[in-house]
From Swiss-Prot:
This is Type II methyltransferase M.BsuBI. It holds the Pfam family Eco57I. The keyword Endoplasmic reticulum does not apply. InterPro entries: DNA_methylase_N6_adenine_CS, MethylTrfase_TaqI-like_dom, N4_N6_ade-DNA_methylase, SAM-dependent_MTases_sf. The gene is hsdBM. It is an enzyme of class 2 (transferase). GO terms for biological process: DNA restriction-modification system; methylation. Disulfide bonds: none annotated. The keyword DNA-binding applies. It catalyses: a 2'-deoxyadenosine in DNA + S-adenosyl-L-methionine = an N(6)-methyl-2'-deoxyadenosine in DNA + S-adenosyl-L-homocysteine + H(+). GO terms for molecular function: DNA binding; site-specific DNA-methyltransferase (adenine-specific) activity.
Length: 501
């Protein structure tokens, strides 16, 4: 079998540069090592009489790994449905299946079609065998395409008719696959980790959690290892779901790369993966068996809403108000703050940079301006040079002499009713958000470098009293507040609060 799988992988490398519509179709072929690992995740006791779906089959890399797994388990028959939109790949799919003809009886259908259309129509057509539950799949293995779905597209409308709301082809493929499975059916797929959190994938997460149980999730330590031949830099996760079964503990594994030579594995109660009261249904993937400082302390249990603090995305989208932007402050302008203006506890303003420093105050922009005051800002996008995912800064009213200020769209702003918050709370939030424990905790459930307002709303914070104490300490030691000092002071305050509880 090894020789056959090597042949399929050589074919993958040969065909990859020949793809004419790779970007348009969001095609990324699966390397042999990943295909084999994914095929090994299926339960041994469920492999007989397999009815297999490979959606976005490519040249058949995943199907070949699945067939090799069946053969290794001495199973002599498989029923395959391979869906592929690119008709150029049909002969390669046929060649892949032909490699196995002497080893296993294959009943296969290669369907050259748009999977979303094929699946949605199959589910919506009352006369369809799939819609009538007469023919469902027992196994699905997929590496779906990566491409955004336009809001007014045919795909979006079809998905909505099928009861699915999602924004990317990969989540659409997985959601439809879930609906095409029989109860007890197993689905193994590899997609970007970004589906685990954020508002855009909330409906998708709900769809999965309502209809399946999560059995296993696997991560790679390096974000560029899964599809290195395609130079994909997104962090990917391999997941195994089971349709219609009771949720139990979840296995989390991690490997350094796609050789899978060294794998660490842990088991977690499901409530550690998806917190029971989380309406966003964020999926937390902890890759160590150690509890973070945030998890250790039960007094870190407050949401921003419970602390009477709001968070909003900076409302000024600069390209929409180009005519109002000014390189430097001048008559009739007010400050416009970008992420680059905030460095530690300091505001560097005005600043020589490519971005403007000011915006004309007029009727058009007035609705986006905030009264001057104490605000905490969190950069939405962290740069490669920054060690932390969450990078927070503080605006103080004495930093500028203007009655109102603007925050650009690259910032999240913590405020109260679109006004400033108390000085002590602002500095306390600044220190807490910039702490190492918060960074570690955030990385557990955030698969990308973007920090959204929703991420901050779902985070847990210490009590207002602890934030005030932390803030007072920052104010008193403003010149000597480094990473080590912040981490040490936060732990001290949390331990003292726990001891007094």
């Amino acid at each position: 079998m090894t020789q056959i799988l090597e042949t399929v992988d050589k074919s993958r490398l040969t065909v990859n540069p020949l793809l004419k519509n790779k970007s348009e179709l969001g095609q990324f072929f699966t390397p042999s090592s990943i295909s084999i690992f994914m095929a090994c995740l299926f339960s041994e006791d469920k492999l007989n009489n397999a009815k297999v779906l490979d959606a976005g089959a490519g040249i058949g890399s995943l199907t070949s790994a699945f067939l090799a797994r069946l053969i290794s388990e001495n199973i002599g028959k498989a029923d395959l449905h391979l869906l592929e939109i690119d008709e150029m790949l049909e002969p390669y799919l046929s060649e892949t299946l032909a490699l196995f003809k002497d080893y296993i009886e294959i009943n296969s259908q290669i369907i050259i079609d748009d999977f979303i259309e094929w699946a949605a129509y199959s589910l919506l057509d009352e006369e369809s065998l799939l819609a009538k539950d007469k023919q469902r799949f027992t196994h699905a293995i997929l590496n779906p395409p990566y491409k955004k779905i336009k809001s007014n597209s045919k795909h979006r409308k079809l998905l909505r008719k099928a009861g699915i709301e999602t924004v990317n082809l990969y989540s659409a493929f997985v959601a439809l696959t879930v609906d095409l499975m029989s109860d007890g059916g197993e689905i193994v797929f590899i997609i970007p980790r970004s589906f685990c959190n954020g508002p855009y994938f909330r409906h998708f997460r709900q769809h999965l959690l309502n209809k399946t149980s999560i059995k296993h999730m696997h991560l790679f330590e390096s974000r560029d290892k899964a599809f290195k031949d395609d130079e994909v830099l997104q962090e990917n996760v391999i997941s195994k779901l089971e349709k219609g079964t009771v949720q139990e503990d979840v296995k989390i594994s991690i490997s350094t790369d796609d050789s899978f030579s060294v794998i660490r594995s842990y088991r977690y109660p499901f409530e550690k993966i998806v917190q029971p009261n989380d309406i966003e249904k964020f999926i937390h993937i902890n890759t160590t068996n150690e509890e973070t400082l945030i998890e250790k302390h039960p007094n870190v249990c407050y949401s921003l809403e419970e602390l009477n603090i709001e968070v909003s995305t900076g409302p000024v989208v600069d390209f929409r108000v180009k005519e109002n932007l000014r390189e430097m402050p001048g008559e009739g302008t007010v400050p416009l703050f970008y992420p680059n203006h905030f460095v530690g506890t300091s505001l560097e303003y005005p600043k020589m940079m490519k971005k403007p420093n000011a915006i004309i105050r007029n009727e058009k922009v007035e609705k986006w301006l905030y009264p001057n005051g104490h605000y905490v800002v969190v950069k939405r996008f962290s740069s490669k040079e920054e060690k932390r995912r969450i990078v927070a800064g503080v605006l103080t009213p004495e930093s500028v002499n203007d009655p109102v200020v603007g925050f650009e769209n690259g910032l999240n702003v913590l405020h109260y009713n679109k006004s400033g918050i108390s000085k002590e709370v602002a500095y306390g939030l600044y220190a807490y958000l910039n702490s190492t424990p918060v960074d570690k905790y955030f990385r557990i459930f955030n698969g990308h470098t973007q920090v959204n307002a929703t991420d901050l709303r779902t985070m847990k914070f210490p009590s207002r009293d602890i934030l005030i104490s932390l803030g007072k300490w920052v104010i008193e030691n403003i010149e000597n507040v480094g990473q080590v000092e912040i981490d040490s002071k936060l732990e001290e305050l949390l331990l003292n609060d726990r001891g007094n509880a």
